[in-house]
Amino acid sequence: MAVPRRKTSPSRRGMRRSADAIKRPTYVEDKDSGELRRPHHLDLKTGMYKGRQVLKKKDS
């Protein structure tokens, strides 16, 4: 059975755990519609991505 040779220090343990935190999703305001959307994602209401029409506009 594998056993560690040395005790993991609190500093090293903390550095290992630093990547475990769940981060809140970021949102940006769309330039065209003013709606909030995820960065690098298309706007589902308008169907625009990077200034181009990729999907048909959602009729609601």
From Swiss-Prot:
SUPFAM superfamilies: Zn-binding ribosomal proteins (SSF57829). Residues 17-44 have a biased composition (Basic and acidic residues). Residues 1-60 are annotated as: Disordered. Transmembrane segments: none annotated. GO terms for cellular component: large ribosomal subunit. Belongs to the bacterial ribosomal protein bL32 family. Keywords: Ribonucleoprotein, Ribosomal protein. Residues 1-16 have a biased composition (Basic residues). It comes from the Bacteria. InterPro entries: Ribosomal_bL32, Ribosomal_bL32_bact, Ribosomal_zn-bd. This is Large ribosomal subunit protein bL32. GO terms for biological process: translation. It comes from Rhodopseudomonas palustris (strain ATCC BAA-98 / CGA009). GO terms for molecular function: structural constituent of ribosome. Signal peptide: none annotated.
